[in-house]
A protein has these predicted regions:
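Aromatic-rich transmembrane-lumenal/periplasmic boundary elements in polytopic membrane proteins
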Residues: 58-97, 284-287, 294-295, 303-379, ...
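Transmembrane-helix signature of polytopic, membrane-embedded enzymes
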Residues: 46-47, 151-174, 211-217, 231-232, ...
Length: 536
């Protein structure tokens, strides 16, 4: 033995295994840049294709106007012919269903929603004609499919994970509420789409604004200045794009303005927090009094201009409802505002009339659903039901049922609501920016309706904030999944729980899909879906 040599007494280090076998396999599968690019784009494309199949399959069934299609499809058809919504004879639906689609009148129809959503429906009518029920619904189906792609890309930006993005898109693709609202030609799917597009623009603006604010402050401090308030950032193209998107949402339904207001407030808060992180003393005052007015001017006027543009057909024609109101004796404004052109006086009167209609709407309806019960999924909307006889519509032995019920996948919905409630707690504890942004989407789509619990409203309005519920659920799934650096036990458990949840959600969607797509089923099978008495 060499003098002075020492013998190590340190034993082998017991290193706990990390990750899972699935992680190892996935790592080998994506071991090349080409494969990673394929997953990066292929995953979102695959869930979008799945969404397209579920929304387009047998889209023309039933060949009958469903629920509020009686208003919006016929309005869209007259928009194509007149540029404004015109009236129809009473009880005209049977004729329209039978292909006699040109019985409309030249008299204007009183409509209480802006025209944009109906113009979108009209695109399908223009391509396929009004005698083809596929043409009635194709625009809405395409919009619903594109919404899945947008949500997937938004989720990847939020969570920096293609896996979580694909999970979010998959849940949106297979959810029944999203499927039904993409398979009927009504307005709310378009409202959801444009609001989600605005959300995506707000997300992009958040990073754009933060980077430029930091650069401007660094430049000021490098020059020896000591700014207390910080600069105003005027060039914010993503914010302008958000204004366009929210204006388009409002051009479908006025509730699009809820998203404009909610995210307008959100932008002030985000700017204040960004200035505080950058060490500005007057961060709150600067956000409200300095950047706030600039943000308002970049967002709100843009939205209003886009909203007004959605009424172009009404402005450029002469026969729209109330189009010539101000020109009738005794109606024109007098005094301070007498200079306002008559067309604008008529327009403002029409908008006031629409507002009065909505706030006073309290007519009973069998599927009216109080907003207080929306999150519990108490009263979903039955949009269409038929009992075909033996030998008709694929019924092998009566009694049979065909239904279009706008009900979410119950597992996905209730899990998403629970996740959103957890995110409220998490926001209080952690202040994560992703959590705040997601909850603002939920709040903008849901909370304003709590002011109107006495009005006639419906569960299907929740499509407007469904994407944000799904983002909340995806956020929680990400927490359950954990990271590759977690212990093997924790990581394997997280993967297993997530896999079981996704499999159960898929099975339930397969179970419910016939009732989302007007597929003929035995009456006993339809009855199996009445989990609550209020679901009938």
């Amino acid at each position: 033995m060499v003098s002075g040599a020492t013998t190590s007494t340190t034993g082998p280090i017991d290193v706990e295994p990390r990750g899972s076998r699935l992680d190892d396999w996935w790592g080998r599968l994506l071991s090349t840049p080409g494969r990673r690019r394929l997953w990066y784009w292929g995953g979102p494309i695959l869930v979008t294709l799945l969404a397209a199949v579920l929304r387009l399959w047998n889209l023309g069934t039933p060949h009958a106007l469903v629920f509020d299609e009686t208003f919006y499809v016929k309005d869209a058809w007259t928009l194509l012919h007149h540029g404004y919504e015109s009236a129809w004879p009473a009880e005209s639906d049977p004729d329209f269903n039978a292909g006699r689609v040109n019985g409309f009148l030249t008299d204007p129809a009183y409509v209480v929603h802006p025209p944009l959503g109906k113009w979108l429906i009209a695109l399908g009518l223009g391509v396929f004609g009004a005698t083809d029920s596929f043409g009635w619904r194709i625009s809405t189906a395409i919009i619903g499919t594109l919404a899945v792609l947008i949500l997937t890309l938004v989720a990847r930006k939020l969570f920096a994970s293609t896996l979580l993005a694909v999970i979010a898109g998959f849940l949106f693709a297979i959810d029944g509420h999203a499927i039904v609202m993409s398979r009927v030609a009504i307005l709310d799917n378009s409202l959801m789409f444009f609001a989600l597009l605005g959300f995506a623009m707000i997300l992009a603006d958040r990073d754009w604004h933060a980077r430029r604010l930091a650069v401007r402050l660094d430049a000021a401090r490098s020059s020896g200045a000591s700014p207390d308030w910080g600069p105003v950032i005027w060039w914010r193209p993503w914010l302008i794009a958000a204004g366009v998107a929210f204006g388009l949402a409002a051009g479908v339904k006025w509730s699009g303005f809820y998203f404009l207001a909610g995210f307008g407030l959100y932008l002030i808060v985000v700017d204040a927090l960004a200035r505080r992180r950058l060490g500005l003393d007057a961060w709150f005052s600067a956000a409200v009094l300095k950047q706030g007015p600039a943000t308002f001017l970049l967002l709100v006027p843009v939205s209003l201009v886009v909203y007004l543009a959605s009424w172009t057909g009404w402005f450029v024609t002469d026969n729209g409802y109330y189009r010539n109101w101000a020109e009738q004796a005794g109606n024109a404004w007098t005094g301070l505002f007498s200079w306002v052109p008559s067309v604008w006086q008529s327009f403002f009167f029409y908008q006031q009339s629409i507002y009065n209609f909505h706030v006073g709407l309290a007519a009973p309806h069998p599927y009216s659903a109080n907003p207080l019960g929306w999150l519990a999924l108490i009263r979903p909307t039955s949009m269409w039901y038929d009992s075909p006889a033996t030998g008709a519509s694929g019924c092998e032995l009566a009694p049979c049922s065909q239904a279009i019920t706008s009900i979410a996948n119950p597992l996905i919905w209730w899990a998403a609501v629970a996740a959103s409630l957890y995110l409220v707690y998490r926001l209080i504890r952690t202040r994560q920016w992703q959590v705040g942004l997601i909850l603002m989407g939920v709040a903008a789509g849901y909370l304003p309706w709590l002011m109107y619990t006495e009005r006639t409203v419906f569960q299907f309005y929740t499509i407007a904030f469904l994407p944000y519920l799904l983002l909340a659920l995806t956020f929680v799934i990400g927490l359950i999944l954990g990271k590759r650096s977690d212990s093997q036990y924790e990581r394997t458990r997280g993967l297993s729980v997530t896999a079981v949840f996704l499999v159960l959600a898929t099975v339930l969607s397969a179970f419910w899909y016939p009732l989302w797509s007007a597929t003929t089923v035995p009456f006993w099978f339809w009855s199996l879906h009445s989990w609550l008495s209020t679901w009938v």
